[in-house]
Amino acid sequence: MIRHAHLVGFGLAGALLMHQLQKRGVRVTVNDRVDPQSSSHVAAGMITPITGQRVKPTWRGQELQEFARRTYAELEHDLGISLWKDWSLVRVFRTDTMRT
């Protein structure tokens, strides 16, 4: 059994990994470089079940979104803060060709 883990990077992925490890009793230390241009700061943890120009559902997107909802709800409870917000997506097509 792993007793200690050291994470390099504490963006969204690092924070979620730390949470999962700590749930399993692993002591975690972290090194992180503060970068305001990192994807964790720029995209703010955005999750979308669709991808690509054709706006198709992501492979296993629904399953992953359900896992994310459960994980974020657990973190919200543990930390006493709000982390999850549902947003609507509006896709504007300039031409009929873009619509198909």
Model segments located where?
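Beta1/beta-strand and adjacent pyrophosphate-binding region of the FAD-binding site
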Residues: 1-13
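Short beta-strand/turn micro-motifs composed of small residues
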Residues: 9, 32, 93
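Dinucleotide-binding Rossmann-like beta1-alpha1 core, especially the glycine-rich loop
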Residues: 46-100
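Short polar catalytic/cofactor-binding loops
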Residues: 10-12, 35, 52
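Glycine-rich FAD pyrophosphate-binding loop
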Residues: 22-41
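Accessory recognition modules or surfaces
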Residues: 1-3, 38-39, 43
